[in-house]
Amino acid sequence: MDAGKGEYQIAKSDEEWRRELTPEQYGVLRQAGTEQPWTGELLDESRAGVYACAACGAELFRSGTKFDSGCGWPSFYESVRPEAVELLEDTRLGITRTEVRCANCGSHLGHVFPDGFRTPTGDRYCMNSISLDFQPEDE
């Protein structure tokens, strides 16, 4: 995975990440893969709560900012704090996109698109379910 800002609060070796994550999680979180649309466990999650990084547990999104974008991945219009995520230019597919990573550990979460959807920010954070852990508010 390409380096982002270089230093993260949670810094582990590739070997440590491989031991701690499932192969599917590793492929998305550490190798910037993408899960298939409409397959993620959190796509239809509607309870109140917080979405945290599946790799390090850092809080990333709140359920109040989640919306149905119809794209097949969980979508949010903003992160819990601007500094909770890291935004990087991604040109891997021959187009320019903005990659979203966890600012705490550098794990790949998905991409953000400024395509409106009549949200308060106009942004659509299109996240991989496998990159997130949902923590219900009532637990």
UniProtKB/Swiss-Prot annotation:
It catalyses: L-methionyl-[protein] + [thioredoxin]-disulfide + H2O = L-methionyl-(R)-S-oxide-[protein] + [thioredoxin]-dithiol. Binds 1 zinc ion per subunit. The zinc ion is important for the structural integrity of the protein. Keywords: Metal-binding, Oxidoreductase, Zinc. GO terms for cellular component: cytoplasm. InterPro entries: Met_Sox_Rdtase_MsrB (IPR028427), Met_Sox_Rdtase_MsrB_dom (IPR002579), Mss4-like_sf (IPR011057). Gene3D superfamilies: Peptide methionine sulfoxide reductase. Its cofactor is Zn(2+). The keyword Zinc applies. One of its GO terms (molecular function) is zinc ion binding. The keyword Metal-binding applies. Residues 14-137 form the MsrB domain. Belongs to the MsrB Met sulfoxide reductase family. PANTHER family: METHIONINE SULFOXIDE REDUCTASE, METHIONINE-R-SULFOXIDE REDUCTASE B1. This is Peptide methionine sulfoxide reductase MsrB.
